[in-house]
Amino acid sequence: MSTQTRSGGGGGGGGRNKEAGGGSGGGAAGGNNEKSGGSTGAASGAGAGGASATHTVVKAKQPTAEQIRIAQITDIKSGMDDPKIQEKIQSLMETTQRSEEEVCCALQECDSDLDRAVIFLLETLPVGAFATTSKKKKSKSQAAAQKDGEDGGDWETTGPTTVGGASVQLGGINVDLKEQQRRGGNRGGSGNQRSGGPGRGGRAGGYRDGGGDRDRDRDRNGYDKGGEGGGYRNRAGGDGGRMRGGRDGPGGPGRGNYGSRGGRGGGPRLGTRGPGSRDQNRGSRMMNNDHQEIDSWDPVTTPANANDLKPEDCTAFTDTWGDWDNEEYTGTLADTKGYAGAVASTTAPSAGAGAQQQQSQQSTQTGVPPAASNVTELAAPPGLEQQVLNPPPPKDTELVQQYSTTVVSSTATAAVAAGGATGVASVVPQYSDLHAGTPNATTAAQHLRQALDMPPMNTSSSLSAEQSQYFSTLSSQNSNLQPTPSAVGFQQQPPAGVVASQPPTTVVPAVQQQQQPPQPNSVQYPTAFVGATSDATAAAAAAGAPTSYAAAATQQPPVRRQRARVPPPSKIPSSAVEMPGDNMNNIGYLDVQFGGLDFGADDSFDAVVSDKFNSTTGTAGSSTVQQQQQGAQVPPATVGVQPPAPQSQLQQQQQQVVSQAPQQTPKPSNLPGAPGLASSQIMPGQGTTEALSSQNDGLANSYSRTNASGSVSTSVSAGVNSMSNAAAALDQLTKSDPYGQSASTNTALTGGYQNAPYSSTQANKTASYPPTGAPQGYNNMSYSNNQVTNAYPPSTNNYSSYNQGNVNAYQPPSSSVTNNVVPNNNTGNSVGGVSNQSNLPVNNNAVNSSSNNNAGGYLSSQYPVSQTSSAFPSQQNYQNSSQNVYGNTGLNSNTGVASSTVSNSSTNNSNNNVTSSSSLPISSVVSTTTKSSSTTSGTSVVTNLPMVNPYIQAPGLPFYQQAAVYSYEDLQLMQQRMPHVPGFYDINYQTPTSLGAAGVRDANLGSVAYSTMSDGRFTRTDNNSSPVSNVPSSLSQQTGSGGPMLNLPYAYFYGGNMMPASGFQYGTPVYPQQMPTNAATSGGQFQKPAYNTGGYGSATGYDTLGQSGQDYNKNAYQASIVGQQQSKGQTVANQQSGSGSGSDMAPSMYGKNHVAINKVNYDKQSFHSGTPPPYNIAGTQTAGTTSAQPYGQHLAYIPTMATHHNINMHQNMHQDSNSSGQRPQNNNQGKTASKQQGYSASTYWTGPN
């Protein structure tokens, strides 16, 4: 075969090589030419030379066959092409009946080992692997190549195709060919070959030749060669011509993969190797190796698209996740319709699931009265169950109970369980999802396990149909509990729910059957569900069970959504490229408030979450409830009220039960407006907010549609359940779970009204709001706020606590637990944002963090709480969870976001503090609403984080690790808190306590590199004369700079794990910015203990920062919001600092320890005037935390940092460069402050200067 000739390459090419060879200027060319056979030969000669024009004729020096062989053997390019390659190819082709291209590929892959090649061909290389490629690029080069191929046959084709091509072709001679192409191409047809002149198989030889290199690259890329970078491909590349030869044109490169050898049979190969083929090949070979998309970062997006990202779901981020997490996809996003049940699949398992659920309920209720009796013990829906982190079933009943309990405790489900515990039936139904038939705990346990096995995330974004049902059932049951009479189905059910194990459960089973199918419907959110909720008939009519199941099934993809909800890190740095979710991006906003990072203040992610979750989850969970409520709007309204009960879970449920009667009444009333809302609910706050009214309407509408979650509001109480639900998380936002939870509680406490209001209002609001801007929600929120504030408060105490939580917020522990909102895992936790941290588990819910406490709609917040709560178990939380969990990172905000949004505002309304708590994303919403003061920025930061500056605590102080929950990224960074480099500010060497005279700046630190040099730039001479004569002159000298002149560590210090700001999206420098002190006069900004107080310790008190705190608010940091966040709140934080009596730290300490100091203008003398003096380096000034040095003081002080900007480091260092803290005098700084104010802007104090 020509091939042989080719393989003969130079050798075979002998004669032809002469022709072509000359042209080729190499045996390779010759070989190709030869291969080309005479016909091609001449052409090859010309073409092959690539230089052929130039060298073609030069037959004078044709390498002898021996020379060629030697060249081939020694030529690395020919690489595996040993002279006998052609023979091997021929042999393989005969033995394996594979095309030359495939054979070449196999040989290439197998390093020319025939045996391995045979095996490779037979076992590995798919038949026709290269066949498809043929036509792709046949066009230009291929045409030529083909032409050649036709002429010369496979190999020949190449040769003739291009001068270079011919060379390239050289079968055996690939090396030479390539070389020739290189040489000859360069020389002779360098233009062609090298250039990729058309000669080269028409494909520009250059391309090909270059191609050779290119091929090599391609190989490197793994596209083509996937294997040898150059080897095969290179050869091919070098062959380029060869590969190109037949494949020429596209073939060659196209053929990148196997075909590298592909040149062979160029003609055929051409046909075979189309670029398309190349992909295909790549598919084959690369398949193993890389994806064709290997180069692109985009693939993430693309996959997302491939996954049928829905615009609605379309957070690129989210879908991308879906794509990457294919293995985890339970459904296809394409099918995702509403955000209805994310876990639909679980639910969807059988259209009969509803029936099964019914059975399961019946059996469970009947069979497992104990579990039923256990309000908390609802079987979580599969998704939720999986969320429940601990699903081990101890016993049948216990299993269910435990799971239920576990689920309840650890999951949003827990909330539902608690709230909806009434309906063991509900529980069962969920299990029924799992396999409705089994009342048996074991089965339930199995189901749980299954659920657990299921991707946990799914539940989180949206409730699966199952979950939706579950929560809906819970809420409806609760609702039923309250308004048992309202709906037949519910009525029956409530007893079941109320009396978890009541015989009525029997009825409940029927009801549940009714409901349950509806619940699936609820997932759909069609009225059917509601109808079903309304009565069995409705359920039947809804045919919701099947439909809902279908919907659920369809929705199952939404489960996927959930996944998306908490996108796993994509393999492609989707987030790096674009921070996941906007929350992260928000962080990227570079809100300088280091401490007050806006981890998700961004609403966009919220929107996603809202859309996804609110729509999906909300829809699934809330909507389910809502729809039950709405659809069954009539009596179901009662359900609507009821739903909150689930949230409170037991308590609230009970409370609600107590208050339900009232609410019931309102509910009916609400039904018209919003099934979910009780009229009382609506009345108090909702009336307050027209939004509520609208929401009521909207609830009916939007709730029923997307924001069922919103509707969940009342539903939300259920929403809490929803919250319990993963989806509910958002719902909760919408629902304003707190209301849901608290609300439900409130309802109990307050009366239906609060519960409803929050739930309704917020929920309603939320429903529309989250997706929307949340502002309405927030208006709603505001109104919610009122509600919260008004009626709610009683019930909201938790929230109050939350507020306190705000303070707490920083302290994750925060009573938040108190909040029932947390019903699930948070149950214990107050809603306080803290709660979320503390309760990451479930439902901890931002609610907690956000204001769950706020209790306002904070469910929304709660949602965030959820996020915070991040109880993974409850996916709803899950979302939150995501937030909470760092892993959930983006979600944090996200979760928070939607909910946050609501939350925030709600929070804000509820309390300012809350605001900060909710602070998250909501901030914007919050801003929009109440408190916006809070503050967006407040929002930005999760208040709950004890974000004290995690950075420098004190010079010697190791980073005090705070558990503050930053966003995921923050976490990444934060974790590294350690004394990063020596405490970052700490000097790595122990500095002498006194540097020469009282820490004269000039004091040399022998160990420190430049310490000896006096700072000529900033001579201290000023200092001595400086007005601050009060300070000991030595100090005064030092005053300005206040420390040996040590180079500060970089503000952005990447070492020591700390990666301060720059590591963060927001580039706040590690040094906390000093707030401009101008605003804060002397001590005001950062109060420091007296300079020489003997360490902050003595400064027993940092002031509460009363002023300071306020200053914070006032100061530039406002944006930081930290201040907004409330330094008031902060004051509490200060308490944390526990520095001592707050008052000790009177501004006087700072400010004017020395009259002169205050007067002194350090601009010049303290070289740091513009820039704060180096942060006290550890040894400097007061080398020690105890030292008078403010920094040291910071130790105690730091905790104060509740404010999000890290005041400690920056401020003290800046102000108190030296212990004397001359500089710190705020006045002085105040003066300079104007300059310095830039700091906040610049982020790095030096920047401004």
Curated annotation (Swiss-Prot):
CDD domains: UBA_UBP2_like. Residues 210-227 have a biased composition (Basic and acidic residues). Residues 7-30, 38-50, 186-209, 228-240, 248-269 have a biased composition (Gly residues). PANTHER family: PROTEIN LINGERER, UBIQUITIN ASSOCIATED PROTEIN 2-LIKE/LINGERER. Disulfide bonds: none annotated. Residues 1-66, 132-312, 350-375, 454-506, 549-579, 616-717, 738-922, 1016-1042, 1124-1149, 1164-1186, 1211-1249 are annotated as: Disordered. The gene is lig. It comes from Anopheles gambiae (African malaria mosquito). The keyword Cytoplasm applies. Signal peptide: none annotated. One of its GO terms (biological process) is copulation. Keywords: Behavior, Cytoplasm, Phosphoprotein. Residues 350-369, 549-559, 616-639, 647-664, 706-717, 811-861, 874-884, 892-922, 1023-1034 have a biased composition (Low complexity). Acts in the nervous system to mediate the control of copulatory organs during courtship. This is Protein lingerer. GO terms for cellular component: cytoplasm; nucleus. Its main location: cytoplasm. Transmembrane segments: none annotated.
